[in-house]
């Protein structure tokens, strides 16, 4: 079992937390992490690209000249693809780029990135993050006390609304819960700040 130091909100050591090696101590599988990141980035694409085909372009209902007798090539519409201003053939249409990977693959990727953060000492555990009201300045003090001045992903337990509201306006700070933290979020952060309750939830979900 891997042990990490446990801090309180003031930055003082409050003991140690024992992490489950099956989740936080595995050999990272880079191939699986890569596949999941590509999947999650694809899901973020809007996919709203669109062009007009010949039926969508305005005009072109009248045959430009008669079929025979002019010496010119036969034409049925000035909105055919070969005309300037005509419709596009086989152009992009709005679509979703999202696709799902197997649940086991997604879980292995999460375990891999969590394990990597723990191995690199970029996993900061706190006993709790409790606030009586949403206060951005108070959360900034917590980060300063914990010597966190880089891009950080804060992982909270469900229902800790005041902490989430306190952190969301800070630059380089992203907030997630134990069930919503994604592989992409974790990889994009320099450090993880995780509450003790969130650690328990992560171990419950990924067990």
From Swiss-Prot:
Molecular function in Gene Ontology: rRNA binding; structural constituent of ribosome
HAMAP family the UniProt entry points to: Ribosomal_uL4_B
Lineage: Bacteria, Bacillati, Bacillota, Bacilli, Lactobacillales
Keyword rRNA-binding: yes
UniProt-listed Pfam families: Ribosomal_L4
Similarity comment: Belongs to the universal ribosomal protein uL4 family.
Protein name in the entry: Large ribosomal subunit protein uL4
GO terms (BP aspect): translation
Region (Disordered) location: 49-78
Subunit structure: Part of the 50S ribosomal subunit.
């Amino acid at each position: 079992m891997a042990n990490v130091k446990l801090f309180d909100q003031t930055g003082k050591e409050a003991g140690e937390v024992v992490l489950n090696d099956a989740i936080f101590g595995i050999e990272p599988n880079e191939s699986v992490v890569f596949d999941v990141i590509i999947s999650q980035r694809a899901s973020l694409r809007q996919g709203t690209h669109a062009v007009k085909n010949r039926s969508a372009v305005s005009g072109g209902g009248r045959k430009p000249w008669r079929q025979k007798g002019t010496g010119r090539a036969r034409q049925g519409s000035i909105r055919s693809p070969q005309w300037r201003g005509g419709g596009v053939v086989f152009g992009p249409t709005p679509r979703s780029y999202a696709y799902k990977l197997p649940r086991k693959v997604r879980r292995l990727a999460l375990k891999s990135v969590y394990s990597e953060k723990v191995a690199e000492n970029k996993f900061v555990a706190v006993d709790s993050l409790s606030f009586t009201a949403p206060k951005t300045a108070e959360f900034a003090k917590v980060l300063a006390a914990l010597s966190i001045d880089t891009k950080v992903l804060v992982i909270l337990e469900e229902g800790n609304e005041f902490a989430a509201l306190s952190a969301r306006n800070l630059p380089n700070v992203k907030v997630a819960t134990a069930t919503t933290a994604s592989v992409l979020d974790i990889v994009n952060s320099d450090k993880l700040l995780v509450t003790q309750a969130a650690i328990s939830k992560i171990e419950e979900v990924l067990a």
